[in-house]
Amino acid sequence: MKRIAVLTSGGDAPGMNAAIRAVVRQAISEGMEVFGIYDGYAGMVAGEIHPLDAASVGDIISRGGTFLHSARYPEFAQLEGQLKGIEQLKKHGIEGVVVIGGDGSYHGAMRLTEHGFPAIGLPGTIDNDIVGTDFTIGFDTAVTTAMDAIDKIRDTSSSHRRTFVIEVMGRNAGDIALWAGIATGADEIIIPEAGFKMEDIVASIKAGYECGKKHNIIVLAEGVMSAAEFGQKLKEAGDTSDLRVTELGHIQRGGSPTARDRVLASRMGAHAVKLLKEGIGGVAVGIRNEKMVENPILGTAEEGALFSLTAEGKIVVNNPHKADIELSSLNKSLS
């Protein structure tokens, strides 16, 4: 394989630029030509395919977002869209593609492979909801950003003796809420994978204040409900505390990636190129126990929930390849 391309698709994630950089420089070191596909699958169909060299990716490892830009393009799920994209790949002599994104992006990569263009998926999403990898590119940065914001909110929460409901991103996965909640010592962590009773949370808040507690921090995953709705239900259940709600929003998707995300993205990008050089496609790169691994894309993109709650109130990890997490210290809302 002499000529490959790289694209980013779906929601952006810190570390995508580091992955692109690794793909380009590893490919050059292997004697391959590299092209960048701008604006994801939409750009592929439109022919926004341009050559990249080592200088093209200079000084981008520390930048958030993706310099190739990204876009959601549901039309690529249809055969007509796929054939238009493939026509452009053939026009530019592309023989393989590295796709950086989430589960939707992976489906596109699988379609390319089925049409004879080996594609490798790299898990680029802050949600950490891709099966077959302990961590996704961008997750560590998003958790760190959420942690920093929650720490700041804790200061004002304590000053005014308030209860704060803080909504974090994650789509249908509770990973960001879980990790950021543990890291900040949240009083309650509410995630889609675990049930909760509003009256229990109200009782916990009340008991805390009666014992002299100055404030309460509730970290809420967006996949459960909005912070505004949760706050309203909390009041309806009898909460009488001075309540405020905050949605951290897209700040979690931006910013300079952490060292862990930069290294993870660099390792994954380089590994993807090595796979393409061997003619391998239809797989997603992951990390398990700090080692690079490959998994079939289709199964990776279509697995179900990562966590579930047992009848005894314990969280179990459905995906055996997710990183082990110490769950015993979580609050009563998870038990």
Swiss-Prot record:
Cellular location(s): Cytoplasm
Transmembrane regions listed in the UniProt entry: none
EC number(s) per entry: 2.7.1.11
Keyword terms of this UniProt record: Allosteric enzyme, ATP-binding, Cytoplasm, Glycolysis, Kinase, Magnesium, Metal-binding, Nucleotide-binding, Transferase
Coiled coil spans: none
Binding site for ATP: G11, R72, Y73, G102, D103, G104, S105
Activity modulation notes: Allosterically activated by ADP and other diphosphonucleosides, and allosterically inhibited by phosphoenolpyruvate.
Catalytic activity line of the entry: beta-D-fructose 6-phosphate + ATP = beta-D-fructose 1,6-bisphosphate + ADP + H(+)
SUPFAM superfamilies: Phosphofructokinase (SSF53784)
InterPro entries named in the record: ATP_PFK (IPR022953), ATP_PFK_prok-type (IPR012003), PFKA_ATP_prok (IPR012828), Phosphofructokinase_CS (IPR015912), Phosphofructokinase_dom (IPR000023), PKF_sf (IPR035966)
Name of one Pfam family that matches: PFK
Keyword check for Nucleotide-binding: yes
Cofactor(s) recorded in Swiss-Prot or TrEMBL: Mg(2+)
Binding-site positions, substrate: T125, I126, D127, R162, M169, G170, R171, E222, R244, H250, I251, Q252, R253
Gene Ontology CC terms: 6-phosphofructokinase complex
Involved pathway(s): Carbohydrate degradation; glycolysis; D-glyceraldehyde 3-phosphate and glycerone phosphate from D-glucose: step 3/4
GO molecular function: 6-phosphofructokinase activity; AMP binding; ATP binding; fructose-6-phosphate binding; identical protein binding; metal ion binding; monosaccharide binding
Binding of ADP, residues: R21, A22, V23, V24, R25, R154, G185, A186, D187, K213, K214, H215
Catalytic site: D127 (proton acceptor)
Binding-site residues, Mg(2+): D103
Superkingdom, taxonomy of origin: Bacteria
UniProt function note: Catalyzes the phosphorylation of D-fructose 6-phosphate to fructose 1,6-bisphosphate by ATP, the first committing step of glycolysis.
Subunit structure: Homotetramer.
Protein name: ATP-dependent 6-phosphofructokinase
Gene name of this polypeptide: pfkA
